Amino acid sequence: MNRRELIKNIAIISGGLFIGSNFLLSSCKRDDAGSLVLSEDLMNLLAEISETIIPETDTVGAKSVKAAAFIALVFQDIYSEEEQNDFIAALNLVNDKAKEVAGDDFIKLSAEKRVEVFNKVKDPKNKGFLAMYQMILFAYLTSEKGMQASFRY
């Protein structure tokens, strides 16, 4: 199975899971008093995690479509404070595991080490991790370049 087929299948399978109440209720008014903003360090980490999941090959990667910037908007505007905290905890978990396994921050590791770390930390039962993974796929697949690279139309 090539990368294009894999991304397409993942999108189809997780599509139903991904469209949750947050997106259905995103038009509802929300008090932003408790809204968090991703720091520059967390944005950089998210960009590198995104590129690890969807790397640039003969097609564009997640960094090229600015998946992290899109995710930051959704994070700030749609996620509840609890979901934001879960998401940040998942980002920190990846970085902490990188320090444990490879002795350095995730963003400083080689692509091969990043994949190794990511495979050790991924846990679909972790709400924050699942949200992060799904948002990366969603951001990529809803971008023009990501859609053109992944689907034939």
Regions found by a protein language model. Name each.
Residues 1, 5, 21-56:
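C-terminal segment of N-terminal export signals and the immediately downstream linker at the start
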Residues 53, 57-65:
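Long, well-ordered alpha/beta core segments of mature domains
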